[in-house]
A protein has these predicted regions:
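N-terminal export and membrane-targeting signals
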Residues: 1-16
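An acidic-aromatic pocket/loop used at catalytic or ligand-binding sites
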Residues: 2-6, 24-68, 133-239
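Short, intrinsically disordered, charge-biased short linear motifs at domain edges
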Residues: 8-11, 71-78, 111-113, 155-164
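Residue-level signal for mature regions of secreted extracellular proteins and peptides
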Residues: 16, 81-82, 166
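C-terminal motif of bacterial Sec signal peptides marking the signal peptidase cleavage site
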Residues: 19-22
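Short secondary-structure junctions
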Residues: 69-85, 126-136
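A glycine-rich, hydrophobic loop/mini-helix early in the fold
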Residues: 73-104
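Long, charged/polar, surface-exposed segments that mediate recognition or autoinhibition
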Residues: 96-143
């Protein structure tokens, strides 16, 4: 069994696969491509892990990773917009219909690339995710992506040193197994319900669209932080 974590090569964050074996060698059942984290073959739609199983087993792990980052950064987490569960068709072809979950975009402050590396190793080792990163920009920012290409799950992190970083995750289009009833009637938990104990706040001002500073975790009132804004901290994100 392998686990996807953040590792380091030449001083730069990369996503790697740590091989859990006695001597650290690639198992015979694993190809070199798999060991290097290259894309897996896509599973036929009907054979993918169901959306219900994703919501029960996979999404809580990803939310736990976001929680751990927020706790490392002081206990607050911003969000924009709300999480969604929508009907989808496989690759938009209209051939097979299923359901797609997308988390809200979540914002955390005061975390470093080393924090992300360490927390990913602790929280995400049980997921079959493999990943890539963009080249590091001059300001040290990175885009990190990891996913289960066989079933369509993906997580994306926009890391900005010294400012707030953002992440979101989604399931990809998956079949329903019916175990949670009619999904048209299913109500997703709110961000506050997903992250009890954290200070949850809207990431942007409703009127101006400007980034909101994280509230004080002691009072719940808006705080002052030079890590809450900046022209680049939402690069690549849907507004």
């Amino acid at each position: 069994m392998s686990s996807c974590v953040f590792g380091r090569a030449a001083g730069v964050l990369v996503w790697v696969v740590l091989l859990v074996s006695g001597c650290g060698l690639v198992p015979r059942s694993q190809t070199p491509q798999e060991a290097l984290g290259l894309p897996q073959a896509e599973t036929p739609f009907a054979e993918r892990v169901s959306i219900e199983e994703y919501l029960r087993s996979e999404e809580p792990v990803l939310a736990g990773f976001a929680r751990a980052l927020a706790e490392k950064g002081g206990g607050s987490i911003g969000f924009q917009p709300a999480r969604q569960l929508q009907i989808c068709s496989d690759r938009g072809r209209g051939e097979e219909y299923g359901w797609r979950f997308r988390s809200e975009t979540l914002y955390v402050v005061s975390v470093t690339d080393a924090d992300i590396d360490e927390i990913a190793a602790q929280e995400l080792s049980g997921l079959p995710y493999k990943g890539t990163q963009s080249p590091m920009h001059g300001d040290g920012s990175l885009i990190l992506r990891s996913g289960d290409s066989a079933n369509g799950g993906e997580m994306e992190i926009f890391y900005f040193p010294g400012r707030r970083s953002s992440l979101h995750y989604e399931s990809g289009c998956r079949p329903s197994d019916g175990s949670m009833g009619d999904l048209n009637e299913y109500v997703l938990p709110s961000t506050e319900e997903v992250f009890p104990g954290l200070v949850v706040y809207p990431a942007f001002d409703e009127d101006t669209g400007d980034p909101n500073p994280p509230p004080s975790t002691d009072t719940g009132q808006p705080g002052q932080s030079d890590q809450s804004g900046g022209s680049g901290d939402e690069s690549g994100e849907d507004q």
